[in-house]
Amino acid sequence: MKTSVQDFRKLVAQVGEIDQIMIDVEKAEGIYVWDTDKKRYMDMLSGICVGNVGHRNPKVVQAVKEQMDKYMHVMVYGEFVQSPQYRYIQRLKEFLPESLSQIFYVNSGSEAIEGALKAAKLFTKRSEIISCKASYHGSTLGAVSMLSQEEFTRGFRPLLPDCNKIGYNSFEDLEKITERTACVVAEAVAVGEGVKLPIEGWLQALRKRCNETGTVLIFDEIQTGFGRTGKLFAFEHFDGVVPDILCIAKGMGGGMPIGAFVGRDDIMQSLNNHHPLIGHASTFGGHPLGCVAALATLNCIIEDKLMADVERKGTRYRNELTHPLIKQVKGIGLFNCIELREDVDWQKALISCFSEGIITGTHLFNSQCLSLKPALIITDEQITESIERIKTALDKI
C-alpha cells in the first residue's frame, strides 16, 4: 500500500522538506532500498551510518528471530540479569582498550551522550562542558546545549549553563580546558561540516590536556564506529589516544535501535553512587533484541573481516569520483563526503542523485557536502556502478 508524502506529513511530525527525495520504502537488502514503485536505489547513506553490515543482514535477522522466541522486554534496565546484555559487552571488550570496561545501555546516540555527560559531572563534581564548534551530538537538551549555531538553539533557551566551545584542531583553544571542566565531548573524526580529520598531534594534545586538568574525555563515535573508518573505532587510528568514555550507537545494532556509553570503572560507578539511585535510567535500554542484533553485527564485522578492505574501497571513491562540479571527495575508509563547488545548487544535486537511484544526504552544517557512506559489504562492482550513477546525476543538473 502506497502512502503519499502529503498524507504522511499530515500525521507524522517533522519530516523531510524535499518531496522528491521522500521515497516510499517497500523493502531493503544489502546496499539496496526499493520503493513501492519497485525502483531500486543504491544506499550511500546507510541510514546515516546505521547499516554498516547492510540492510537486513541475514545473521542479524536470525539472531533477532531466535531471541524473539525466548523473550523480549521483561524489566527496566539493570533490574534483572539478562544474558544478551552480558554477552555483548563480554565480546566487545575483546576489542576495546582495557580501561573501557563498563557499559551502560540506552536506545540511541543522543541518550548515550546524555548519560556520558551526567556520569562526567557526577564523577568530577564540576559543571563546565566543552565541545567542538560545528559539532552535533544529539537532540536532547544537553546535546543541543553543546551546539554553537544560534539558528539551532534559539528556540530551546534557556540551555544548560556552562557549555563552552573549542575549535576542532585548535591547539590554542586547548588552554580553555581547566580544572573546572567536567568533560570535553569530541569526535576523533569530525562530521558536522563534512568529514574532517584531526591534524597531526591534536588528539594527543587534547588527551594530554584532559589528563593535566582531571577532565573526562568523551569520544562520540556514534557515526564513525563499527568499522566505518577501517578500524572498529576511529580513535584507534591515532596513537596514544583513548577516551575515558566512548559513546556508540547507529552501526552498533545492524538496523535495530540500540546505543551505549562505555567507560572507566571509576567514572561509571559514579552513576551507582548517586542518591537517589537514578544516575541515569532507561526502560528499554539494553533491550534483548537490540543486544543480540548488536552481537551479531559485531561478529559479522570481525568474523567476515569486513574492515580489511574498507580503506581500499574508500580510496576508490576518493580517487575515481571526479567531476567538474566536485571540489573534492574526502574522508577515511568508507566515511566520506562529496564536497560540491560553492556555486552548485546542492538541492538540485541531491534530487538528481535520487532520480538516478542514489540515496545520499547533506552534512548538517555544510549542505555542499553530500554523504558517501555505503555499507562495508559493498562490492567493487557496486562501487563502480555508484560512481557512474553519481557522475550521471551531476551531469543532469
PLM features: residue spans?
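Conserved N-terminal phosphate-binding loop of PLP-dependent enzymes in the Aspartate aminotransferase
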Residues: 1-397
